[in-house]
């Protein structure tokens, strides 16, 4: 059985999100899906030395990233891991001579992401160095083109925290490139998240949120994926990517403006419509990541606070896409209003396995000055069934990743689902007032 996290004197107190990840990782030490990563596609006259200094300073300013956990006698001890800025170097690789330099670089990184993490060492190895929970590699893939690959363990930082770190690296690099002094550090300490959780526990706000989610779970939907499925394989995730650009992006933007919703709500509504149409009218079962950062200053903490919330996506016979958009947007607003509440482990009414939404409505386009930067996700976390991740491109397009559990979806099945989703999204956005049944793709 996993031990209970404890703290040494002056050691960090973990957030609820960190405790959840630690329990899951210790229950399955070989699970690599909590290793998450992305790369920045950097194009232009990059100064690798200045970038190294920007990354070094950022890692120094975020001590909450440097943790280790000691195991022994049924307990887990959280403690700070030493970080020596003067000895730290940004690893550099060059794949520019490969037949496909970008694919070669990504393959190297996927090998890193596929390594099972070692979060703790037994008591007999008390002096052993802790494996880092974060890492970055700069890969030259061509003339004036580099990939800054970032990988993290979810116990150290969540997706929003990664965005904070990336923007800080960009701000420091931009200032150094211009010859300006480093801008003041914007980060708030990790303890702010812990203190906010402590203040929330037992409060009237928590009671109101608990009551809301109890009502929400009183009438559980019929699952949108009713067919028998094999046991999930938590260690194998398949991916298919849908890109929305050009005329498709313009059509999506018009539909979003016309319905007064967000692009995140639009891509969710389209998937809800697809699952409804392809599963005999069963209501889609969804869950969504929420930042769970509502306390003052919480949005400045590069750490882990994310929560997973159930999301109803009801679709009714005769609905148009505009009607589904309005309903999904209302569900998003209600869920976010109660996003701090976490169900106790094993509590009744927990959301069943279904689609997990990993949307990034916050700004993910860092400004590196005279070097353009585009964020490309590589791995986004565990997937029990199906996950939809989306990130906005600097040019206004969308990258939508459909990740599937390898024990649930085969390659061809996922490829077909992604292709049908892309087609249906385009039709729905182009004709948002037509009944869904008139726009449905052919049955798979």
Q: Model regions: which residues?
A:
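AMP-binding/adenylate-forming domain of the ANL superfamily
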Residues: 11-26, 102-108, 162-163, 192, ...
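A short N-terminal helical cap/helix-turn-helix that marks the beginning
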Residues: 68-69, 173-188, 216-223, 333-335, ...
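Extended, hydrophobic beta-loop-alpha segments that form or line the acyl/peptidyl-thioester binding
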Residues: 62, 66, 282-289, 319-321, ...
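Acyl activation and transfer enzymes in specialized metabolism, enriched
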Residues: 13, 43-66, 150-167, 238-280, ...
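His-Asp-centered acyl/peptidyl-transfer active-site segments
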Residues: 8-10, 28-35, 63-64, 121, ...
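Short amphipathic alpha-helices and their capping loops
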Residues: 1-29, 52-98, 132, 167, ...
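Acyl-thioester-dependent condensation/acyltransferase catalytic cores
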Residues: 23, 52, 59-150, 157-158, ...
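Active-site-proximal acidic secondary-structure segment that organizes catalysis
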Residues: 11-13, 23, 134-192, 413-427
């Amino acid at each position: 059985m996993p031990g209970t996290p404890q703290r040494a004197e002056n050691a960090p107190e973990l957030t609820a999100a960190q405790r959840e990840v630690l329990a899951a990782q210790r229950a399955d030490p070989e699970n690599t899906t909590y290793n998450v990563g992305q790369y920045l596609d950097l194009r232009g006259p990059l100064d690798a030395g200045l970038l190294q200094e920007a990354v070094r300073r950022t890692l120094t300013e975020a001590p909450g990233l440097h943790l280790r956990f000691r195991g022994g006698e049924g307990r887990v001890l959280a403690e700070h891991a030493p970080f020596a800025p003067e000895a730290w170097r940004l690893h550099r690789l060059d794949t520019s001579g490969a037949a496909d330099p970008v694919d070669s670089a990504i393959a190297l990184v996927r090998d890193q992401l596929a390594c099972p993490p070692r979060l703790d060492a037994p008591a007999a190895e008390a002096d052993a160095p802790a494996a880092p929970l974060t890492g970055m590699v700069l890969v030259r893939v061509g003339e004036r083109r580099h990939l800054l690959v970032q990988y993290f363990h979810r116990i150290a930082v969540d997706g929003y925290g990664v965005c904070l770190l990336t923007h800080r690296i960009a701000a420091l690099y931009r200032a150094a490139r211009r010859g300006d002094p480093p801008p003041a550090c914007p980060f708030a300490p990790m303890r702010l998240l812990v203190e906010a959780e402590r203040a929330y526990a037992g409060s009237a706000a928590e009671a109101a949120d608990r009551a809301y989610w109890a009502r929400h779970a009183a009438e559980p939907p019929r699952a949108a994926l009713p067919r028998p499925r094999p046991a999930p394989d938590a260690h194998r995730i398949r991916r298919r990517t849908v890109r929305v650009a050009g005329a498709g992006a313009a059509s999506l933007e018009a539909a979003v403006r016309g319905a007064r919703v967000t692009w995140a709500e639009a891509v969710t509504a389209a998937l809800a419509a697809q699952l409804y149409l392809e599963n005999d009218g069963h209501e889609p079962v969804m869950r969504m990541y929420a930042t769970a950062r509502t306390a003052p200053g919480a949005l400045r903490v590069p750490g882990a606070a994310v929560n997973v919330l159930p999301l109803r996506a009801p679709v009714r016979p005769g609905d148009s896409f505009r009607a589904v958009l309005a309903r999904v947007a209302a569900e998003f607003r209600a869920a976010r209003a109660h996003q701090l509440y976490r169900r106790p482990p094993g509590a009744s009414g927990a959301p069943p396995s279904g689609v997990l939404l990993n949307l990034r409505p916050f700004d993910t386009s860092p400004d590196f000055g005279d070097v353009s930067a585009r964020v490309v996700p590589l791995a986004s976390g565990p997937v029990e069934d199906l996950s939809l991740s989306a990130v906005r491109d600097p040019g206004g397009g969308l990258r939508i990743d459909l990740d599937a559990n390898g024990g649930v979806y085969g390659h061809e099945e996922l490829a077909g689902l992604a292709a049908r989703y892309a087609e249906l999204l385009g039709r729905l956005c182009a004709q948002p007032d037509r009944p869904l049944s008139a726009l449905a793709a052919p049955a798979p």
